[in-house]
Amino acid sequence: MPESKYRQQTIRAPRGTVLTAKSWLTEAPLRMLMNNLDPDVAENPHELVVYGGIGRAARNWECYDAIVDALTRLEADETLLIQSGKPVGVFKTHDNAPRVLIANSNLVPHWATWEHFNELDAKGLAMYGQMTAGSWIYIGSQGIVQGTYETFVEAGCQHYNGTLAGRWVLTAGLGGMGGAQPLAATLAGACSLTIECQQSRIDFCLRTRYVDEQAATLDDALARITRYTREGKAVSVALCANAADILPELVNRGVRPDLVTDQTSAHDPLHGYLPSGWRWEEYQKNAQSDPHGTMQAAKRSMAAHVRAMLAFSKMGVPTFDYGNNIRQMAKEMGVENAFDFPGFVPAYIRPLFCRGIGPFRWVALSGDPQDIYKTDAKVKEIVAEDKHLHHWLDMARERIHFQGLPARICWVGLEWRQKLGLAFNEMVRCGEVSAPIVIGRDHLDSGSVASPNRETEAMRDGSDAVSDWPLLNALLNTASGATWVSLHHGGGVGMGFSQHAGMVIVCDGTDEAAARIRRVLHNDPATGVMRHADAGYDLAVECAVEQGLNLPMVAATQGKG
């Protein structure tokens, strides 16, 4: 690895109200960049890796230093441009323009392959930004807990009469994203068995209470699951092993889970999925010396993994892909029916997307957990009738360990995001919280992503692969005045399979911030309603009418028919 991609340095975002940069609008991206690399947040901060295989916050350490320097000196009417983790320019714009514009991992489609990307990465010409790693709004595993929780709850409604009590989930992967699964299952009332090949990741999840227990062997794990489900307890169990070995063994034994999914880093066969029979150190070494052979070995193991998932599905066990592209990898290795089980979005989440409901998250730049608890109370006050949301916030406060700067996530839609943002801004203005708050989201949202094997799988009109939508989302957020806007490629599912956009806006208590919040936090989720209404979803059309959207080709929004 080039020296510039490794540095033995501990980074933590500043806390409190003393500015390092010239304003809160530049202090915010500076703190969030640093927060992404906090050792309590990032998977491998010394190599700038935040999560998701090789999802990095900056291209190399020289680029990181230059970004920090640029943000520190950036004026109120200037915009910093980031090209795949490298600061390439500062330009005069205006006060309401974004302070940072980010483009990560974008390749011309014909060349959008892991092989070509890895060549560029090795030359220092590119960086994989994942979704929130390179866009500086990662908040640790909490960032996906509620989405996973909502998925499990909906699965319980569809398959088990509304409850997962006495049921168990079989899955794999305890990285930055997958680590949310066991806690989400517990919060949804289910037991879970999560297979993870790296003991260090299990240790982290045990320490942060995302996992309750570790089993010594498969027999021990199954005995625990049997006991807890019989007792009606929701307990999460981790097992250090390879999913490509364990799932086929469970099929051979005739073991029948109640839900099966997966969140290994299968999207990146060179860095994210340990081939069966290999040690992790061997995998890392071979990735350098024989990348093609390593990728093929990983994909062969994925094929075995998916065949086992297909076997569970054939047994009648609800089985779904949780967005890591493992079905595609298996299909490339000859598993022709890999897509016989669905992805989680068409199976459980799309009705939420139709209403612009998605992962709304915010971070207290003060570093004070009390600021988050106060905003939790404000959300309950404003969204007063949503008891499901209140239950989520109560559970989150009790069970979720803050990683880095205190943060919260809750899934809310077009109707509420603007109202919550304005309320948070007012809390900053009147001193109810001790410092500004940033509001962002995952790129996994209703209008900000094109990903035919994940968020846009099986769209009603067949527009799964149309990536105009995330481009329009990024352009509109830029025009609306988001504090920083990002446009990425390959997040979640790997090179060639997705394009997606993100935005973050700062609530600094000013009238100018309030005006930007009104635009951004309405327009951003509205693009999701627009995208789904355009695809012919009645629920999205109804939401568009209710919220007064002007969609020229959707007759109902024009007062016709």
UniProtKB/Swiss-Prot annotation:
Could you tell me the Gene Ontology terms of the biological process aspect for this record? L-histidine catabolic process to glutamate and formamide; L-histidine catabolic process to glutamate and formate
Q: Name one GO molecular function term.
A: urocanate hydratase activity
Q: What is its EC number?
A: 4.2.1.49
Q: Mainly resides where? A: cytoplasm
Q: Which reaction does it catalyse?
A: 4-imidazolone-5-propanoate = trans-urocanate + H2O
> Which residue positions are annotated as catalytic?
C410
Gene Ontology CC annotations of this record: cytoplasm
Where is NAD(+) bound in this sequence?
52-53, 130, 176-178, 196, 201, 242-243, 263-267, 273-274, 322, 492
Q: Which UniProt keywords apply?
A: Cytoplasm, Histidine metabolism, Lyase, NAD
Pathway recorded for this protein:
Amino-acid degradation; L-histidine degradation into L-glutamate; N-formimidoyl-L-glutamate from L-histidine: step 2/3
How many cofactor units bind, and how?
A: Binds 1 NAD(+) per subunit.
Q: Which family would the database say this protein is a member of?
A: Belongs to the urocanase family.
Q: What name goes with this protein? A: Urocanate hydratase
Naturally occurring in which organism (per UniProt) = Salmonella dublin (strain CT_02021853)
